[in-house]
């Protein structure tokens, strides 16, 4: 065996001369583990002799030491019941399964170890693979994962069944034995790469070959090497471009085989297609004949919904990355001579902001096919080798051309230039392969690629918005992967510092270049640590796990990559960071070579067991303990998970003759574990969370396998041998890299469940119908665009297609019961699924439901949330007789049909967040209904006969209710009001209820929760509900709380009375012994707490956890003793259970206030910070601890213009933990930031840099404390439970007029503006976000149930030590300059944003802009009324220091004062009331939708939804800017404004809002509503296009007697209407009068701004000046551009009008597009008149030939009818509509065609054209005579 130095020498030689083939000895050496020489056992070569004893072909001792995992992983199912300690800790996908099936007979010689080997074998039963071949397979497996830029190079040979690394090397002397390694002889060695499977070398330099040539070569090789069959199935190499997990997977594998009654009632059916089995069985010599082992698959390290507790770091493949580093660095040196080289500044991590305009991925199959191509296009061969003509659509890379910004960086990712990358791109050279591979950019399969793309494009609907977003989405994936996997910017000559620890915690620091190997460092380390000449090694420790590094590892590159994964940037000084202690992230440890052994505790625990179910997790083992060898024959289940270097020798496997369940979870394996295929009796095999790239074909030998779990690996295909696993019932291959459906599994006809989620599968083959027993299939989060026929899958019960790109589904599965289609692109659904019970169609652009099919007959649950429904079909309701659950939230419904009473079995009905104006009385017929949610609608009254329902829960919050139909007397008169007895939860918050409703409320005697917040109640004395436990009365007009009413509430636990006008609290509150939450904030409390006989004192309410007095500015807490003089009545410390105490603005004259601690949050500050008002509101929810911490620093650093506002939200999977971290952060963060601000300076870049480093430093200090906890130190107060605790953080630093915001996690900050807009200052960091998910998977993590590693709800946080480096603390940073329009800053924890959208939050803030405390409380109360029961913290800061001024003005004081108080809409009610109708000079605006008639005729349902969106935008902006809605006619609005500025800013803002709205898919799919961008990529048109016209004048006002609204009459109105008629869609036309008035105002404004003249002097009155100046500021924030259209003739008006067109500044390019379209229009006026002239001239010629009278006329006279004069043209143009022009064009074309036809007829029959005069008319033939001649000729020809 050669030394490592020799090996490197060989590799260097091979890199220069790739034709030199690797020798057998070299291959064996490089495949061996380099740190345990005694593992090098015997190696034998397999033959293809079927009769050979499998024992002769085992691989002894060859293993992969690259594995690590976490504790408490779920165990796989076993064949027999097991002990509880081998229990499940996770979701159903990993639940224990007890199978009592028969076990295959034991062989004569019980070599149980060979069972392991079967999993490492190949498919064919006629051959067994040799060890050398397995090594080659593993080498190629490591090669199979290449970056996007380089993937084309390997596709040429992989796609058509070649080895994938077929090259000149294969021509060597041993080519018949092995396929050559791609580049490096160590490629298949024990240690893999650290590149997340995305770096591997490229094929050596070979000329491109065609697929036919490949097949011929393949067949020749096949004949020479029958044992290398698995190699011939090598999949194509595609780059790793993970997708983001958008929702949790609720479809996990149900692994309980003892309880499969629901899915094992197999419906007998013969597979429709049995050809596949025959093909597979006859494919012994040509692997290409197998139907579809997925020969081409993109890498998909998508988040898997795994369910493991305390997951440890799962690094990419291995921590040892020297192999790829060697290639990358070598490639970099060579790449400098090519155009493909990227400048080091280019690779930057992407930033989500670039894509924030898109709410979800949108479909385009062309983009799907080009999914992973780097920025530069190049030919990508695709596989066409399939026996199934309707097979897989092999995906191809997408063109990626632009860079995006890294979330933690202020710099942008440079766009990739085509010249810099060429066909394969720099990434290919930087990340893998030798120099020689540069020329092997294959052109094989180009024709197939083009054909495939064309076929795909032909299927795809032309939706540019879908296409654009899909392209951006896929591009971002490539950029993210490239950032972490790119070594091109590494300076090979630069020296990097690295700290290496000794086992006694001493350390030394070395300075090395990046390519320094561990072997090179060893002499220095031995000298530094003064050790002898013994054997030493270095381990990398991350979290609790250690990985031994190979001698050829490059620690500098490992350190660099780990730093990047932990949030540091390439622009940071990474070369000197190794000087610092980085053990809070990772550490290198120098220690002697020693075999693993159990400590005493572990050995005792193991010896106490029965050795039947053996648990060896987390023991840092390299081999099984010696003690196990004495009991191997008893072992039935073995769990060796989370042992980074574990290897199971063959002798151990041989002796474990009963082994039926094997778990090797997270063992860091990049190759399939050796010897596993020798465990012949295995029933359950769990290899999840590794980096396995290839399953050996010999897995067919494990024919007893029932359960296989391979989720979260790097698989791109499955081997043909998989088809032999006939007993397989449960298969989980989620979170892998499949682009094509692995068709080989269709031969496993006993499969019951398959999980294929989190891959990138584009289509399902027809052969899937062979799985006739399959009951559950999970395809969550793939790239499917359609689902075809599944009619042969007779037993399919559940199909999960959430988060795909499905536009149509016609599966026809006869027994399908559960279909989940959330977040797709389905606009209509009409599949024939007669047994369907559950249908999820949430977040689909559905505008109507088709009622034609029978799929609803058995349906019990239907979800249509977040669709585009504007109506619900009555016919549809009649077809849902068994429906029990119906969800229609967040649509545009205005009413429910009366036929809803046909849903007689309905139990749950939710129609929240719609526009319902009434509820049909027929709903009272639903006697089974238990839960009714109607919150956030426009209901004024509830239905009749409400008392007949038996509801337990009713939520009608945020409506316009003033009462119920009928009277309470009618309700009482009911013989037995069922509702009074059944109702338990009632929420009627945010309505217009008054005290008259109390008698009705009191009838609900069993009520537990009552929410009457934000109504108009004044008295509460009539409330008598003894069973009430929660009472919410916030935001009413209570002035007192009667003690009599309180006495009846003995069971009360929660009482919310904030936002009232209470002066005192009754002493009877002390009798509520169970009271735990009391909120009386923002009242007018002023009473003596020592007068406890009459007023409330808290001393008897010992269970109080939440007590809030904040906002009571006149309330005093004074020290006073009780009559006995023993106790201080002001002592708040007696409340031992207290968690939150709010005393903001309260006067404290006592010292008996508890100190803030980990268990209590205390607020005692004033509600002012730097002159700005601020307020805080929070609730504990169900938590028993204070998880959230807010803190403000006024005059931060002692400076008047600075303040710091922070909000921290503790996180932990255990609700009782996580609060300690947030408290520690609160105490130390400000000091860290002060220190770094001093270091980096006061400039903008310095501040942002200080903020970023402050978070990283904070994480260092927190994790440093957690490290000490790991070592047994508890001085910090933290415990081991906090190792999985962390905290989100949002920090707002105000300096002067700038706001700097930094955040990690899900605590969001929003800036509300007075113009109705808002700015999101933070970024959401959750695992489901694409950028976050990509980084998680790159670092080796996974996502389960929307939690990172199944633990954290956020992907960035401080803490979570056990999750490093999957989680990090690098913040997103934003910088905002405050403007006049900014009103309020809102910071809140994540639960608020789940229940209230940004728009609602900002509406509330504008409504309460002068009272931020009330705004915060109202947001909290709204969330509670909508159903929130978790903890929330909200912090509001009012930025407007002139809070007492009115925000909206008119020129008339009476108009301002007399704002109306009528609320016709729940949302509008939160805005300013509508202004009174202006009089005098006003601005009249007319609006109209372009081509609305055409759209209504084409898409009536879609237009119904679109019009609602249009009207909402119009009316919302009217309230914000102060306009009066005069009337509407159809889709046209007439609006009046008191000032020109308010009219213009309204028009501009509406145009911008229309562009941002979500329109139905039908509207955006046609030309009139599709996405149009300008040359810079700015969105210019999308959705409905609205024309607007504005005129200024003095119309005649008149009240409409019918509507009682002001109308305007006269010529001013007429002119305004005509001005709007000139506009095109998206334009705002202005009359000359309006422009003149506007210019006058702007001149006044200029005097105020430039000359500083007083408002009264300029405008004549201060009030008017304030109004106009405020509106001008709003206008300047929006921005505007004027374009002169010139004089235009207005229809019906005598004189011309000079028209000006206005555009928002950001949409100025609309003018160029409109002008261009007009000039290039086919139907422009001049062209039509020219065509008429041509027609007339042709007719003149024809008349002359026919002998007409035209020739007698003079040319001058001819022009009279040839062309129109200008006046005639203008008259025609003015009176003609678009349809008139189309008819005119048709008329002219017909005339021209007829004339030309007659001329040609004469020319053909008469031999030419001859002019005749009128006197010669008898000499020429008429046209009818000519036709007679033609008929005669035809008759003669027939005869």
Swiss-Prot record:
It catalyses: ATP = 3',5'-cyclic AMP + diphosphate. GO terms for cellular component: cytoplasm. Mg(2+) binds at residues 1488, 1531. Binds 1 Mg(2+) ion per subunit. Residues 165-211 have a biased composition (Polar residues). Residues 1483-1620 form the Guanylate cyclase domain. Plays essential roles in regulation of cellular metabolism by catalyzing the synthesis of a second messenger, cAMP. This is Adenylate cyclase. It comes from Lachancea kluyveri (Yeast). The lineage of its organism: Eukaryota, Fungi, Dikarya, Ascomycota, Saccharomycotina.
